[in-house]
């Protein structure tokens, strides 16, 4: 089969080489690569007195956070926890969902919802900070309108795809990181003692003695917020490319942070009033640096928007999120565009910009959500290591170490809750509620689907086919079978064929869709249940693949016809004479929930919220990629309360 968009698969740049490394730098490190724009500024705004011990301690915290959190946890450990080459919290969950722990999905949806919330906040703070650099040239420049204009353009171009400009991201980000490193080295030469920050002693002393340690750590954490995105992009670039390019990126980042620290210690009196990132830039290249910063912010925003589309596409196949219309603006595999989500993200980013106005206030909203994502990833990695037979001691040490580190960062970021962290938690909470309700409601719907053994109905289906007194409904009649167990069939499907309106056809097709734990699987198996009459097709679809049943069934039928396992030529003499194939018609059984069908108030509330959430999605025929002109939807009630009272006779009719 071809990919989900119907196009041939386009290979990703997973091979190690200059091109692969260049593409990796452009795709993976946009978020973490723009952190120098605001991290040092956020540290200075904690209120801690500026002196050598404070700056050395803060820089030491940055260096060792990048080392422990990004390098060891994500590059060395998490990148090895891949799902057939794919990474990210949902890909990791897909590896683990067969485990006996029924609540493990809670960790996944908490992590996914907080990661999505971060994807709304990051473009706002990154672009705003870059544009604020213009204030050093023209203090009265309207930052907010310019930021909103850039954000509008970024979201508007999503519908056209970014294939053409995306190829230049790698070159641009390479120049960006070189700029960070070179300017950092120049600034370091003015205060070489800043290199003492590599000693973790200064970090320990600062955190032990400073009364503002939690505020400082909250600011320091911003340097590693892009680490989760690094893991999510594993499938695009490959582990080796990410690991090798990270060595270069980390070096450039640390050099720039050290350069900013050197400038602060040389300008203690004025450090509070300016952004050290722009302050270390020579005046003759300041405009160029601002342009580069804006471009890097756009690249970072683009990566997060694309990442959001990918996460929600995975969530749909994992039954965490309602099916939505997905477009493929280019022929590049994996490049998606979800119009509803693009609009929702745009509105969210605009509201955050208008609510907080400047990047200093946005810093309070930033970091809290992604800390929770990282904590959930740590717990899932612990399950993964245990499932792979890793030494128990190592697994316990890993979970204990990183739960402690991230727990401390979480505590530090919670101190910013009232100042803006509530915004991230509000967005995360709404997304979590939607995912949780969707998962629970889908389980309820599956729980109350009644099934019957399919082989009990072979004869009657054959009899209906042969009964010419029944008008022919279609040459080929296709049903999507929602029964979980092999060899069983949804009883409402049988009711549709036999009872509701007997449907005579030449061939009956039952489509079983199995969403598998691997990302890009697209396979099928076909079983002939009744020769020349009844067929069962099972489609195995990876969690990154968009289901398009019409397209896939056409390929299945072509395979069967070519191998002479089925003859689909129309049975009408005039059409058969000319070799015209018979028509296809799809029947979708749609269960409608009625609140009065359950006496459980909690269940009623959950299903009512589910009904509201489902309105943002698309109906089942579109969700399955069916040609709606060939589809008939039959609505049946979803009966949850089977204990229906009997009617009591109150009078007898006497016949005279």
Segments predicted by a language model, with ranges:
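The structured alpha-helical core of multi-pass membrane proteins
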Residues: 2-656
């Amino acid at each position: 089969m071809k990919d989900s968009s119907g196009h041939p698969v386009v290979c990703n740049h997973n091979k190690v080489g200059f091109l692969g490394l260049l593409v990796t730098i452009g795709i993976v490190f946009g978020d973490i690569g723009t952190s120098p724009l605001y991290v040092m500024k956020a540290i200075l705004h904690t209120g801690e007195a500026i002196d050598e011990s404070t700056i050395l301690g803060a820089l030491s915290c940055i260096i060792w956070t990048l080392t422990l959190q990004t390098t060891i946890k994500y590059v060395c450990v998490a990148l090895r926890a891949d799902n057939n080459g794919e990474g990210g919290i949902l890909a990791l969950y897909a590896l683990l969902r067969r485990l006996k722990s029924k609540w493990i999905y809670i960790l996944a949806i908490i992590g996914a919802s907080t990661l999505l919330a971060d994807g709304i906040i990051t473009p706002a703070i990154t672009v705003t900070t870059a544009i604020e650099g213009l204030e050093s040239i023209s203090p009265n420049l309207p930052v907010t309108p310019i930021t909103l204009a850039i954000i509008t353009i970024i979201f508007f171009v999503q519908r056209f795809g970014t294939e053409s400009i995306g190829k230049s991201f790698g070159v641009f980000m390479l120049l960006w990181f070189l700029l960070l490193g070179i300017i950092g080295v120049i600034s370091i030469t003015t205060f070489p003692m800043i290199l003492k920050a590599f000693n973790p002693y200064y970090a320990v002393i600062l955190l032990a003695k400073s009364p503002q340690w939690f505020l400082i750590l909250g600011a320091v954490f911003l340097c590693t917020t892009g680490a989760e995105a690094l893991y999510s992009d594993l499938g695009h670039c490959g582990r080796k490319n990410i690991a090798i390019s990270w060595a270069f990126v980390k070096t450039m980042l640390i050099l720039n942070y050290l350069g900013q620290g050197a400038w602060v210690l040389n300008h203690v009196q004025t450090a509070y009033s300016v952004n050290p990132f722009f302050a270390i830039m020579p005046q003759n290249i300041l405009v160029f640096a601002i342009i580069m910063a804006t471009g890097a912010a756009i690249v970072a925003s683009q990566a997060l928007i694309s990442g959001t589309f990918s996460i929600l596409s995975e969530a749909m196949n994992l039954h965490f999120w309602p099916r939505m219309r997905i477009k493929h603006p280019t022929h590049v595999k994996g490049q998606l565009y979800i119009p509803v989500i693009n609009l929702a993200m745009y509105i969210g980013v605009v509201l955050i910009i208008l609510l907080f106005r400047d990047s200093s206030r946005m810093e309070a909203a930033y970091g809290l959500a992604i800390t929770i994502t990282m904590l959930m990833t740590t717990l899932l990695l612990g399950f993964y290591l245990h499932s792979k037979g890793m030494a128990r001691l190592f697994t316990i040490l890993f979970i204990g170490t990183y739960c402690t580190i991230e727990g401390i960062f979480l505590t530090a970021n919670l101190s910013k809750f009232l100042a803006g962290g509530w915004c991230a938690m509000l967005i995360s909470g709404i997304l979590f509620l939607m995912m949780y309700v969707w998962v629970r409601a889908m389980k309820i719907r599956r729980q109350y689907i009644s099934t019957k053994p399919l082989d009990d109905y072979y004869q009657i289906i054959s009899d209906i086919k042969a009964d010419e007194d029944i008008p022919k409904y279609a040459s080929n009649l296709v049903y999507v079978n929602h029964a979980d167990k092999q060899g069983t069939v949804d009883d409402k499907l049988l009711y549709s064929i036999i009872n509701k309106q007997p449907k005579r056809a030449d061939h009956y097709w039952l489509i079983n869709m199995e969403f598998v734990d691997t990302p890009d699987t697209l396979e099928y198996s076909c079983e002939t249940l009744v020769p020349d009459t009844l067929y069962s097709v099972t489609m195995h679809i990876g969690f990154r693949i968009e289901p398009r049943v019409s397209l896939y069934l056409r390929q299945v039928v072509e395979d069967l016809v070519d191998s002479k396992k089925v003859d689909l030529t129309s049975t009408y003499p005039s059409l058969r004479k000319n070799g015209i194939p018979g028509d296809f018609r799809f029947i979708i059984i749609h269960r409608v929930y009625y609140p009065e069908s359950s006496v459980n108030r909690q269940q009623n509330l959950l299903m009512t919220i589910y009904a509201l959430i489902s309105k943002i999605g698309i109906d089942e025929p579109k969700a399955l990629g069916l040609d709606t002109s060939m589809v008939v939807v039959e609505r049946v009630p979803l009966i949850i309360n089977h204990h229906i009272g009997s009617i009591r006779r109150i009078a007898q009719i006497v016949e005279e």
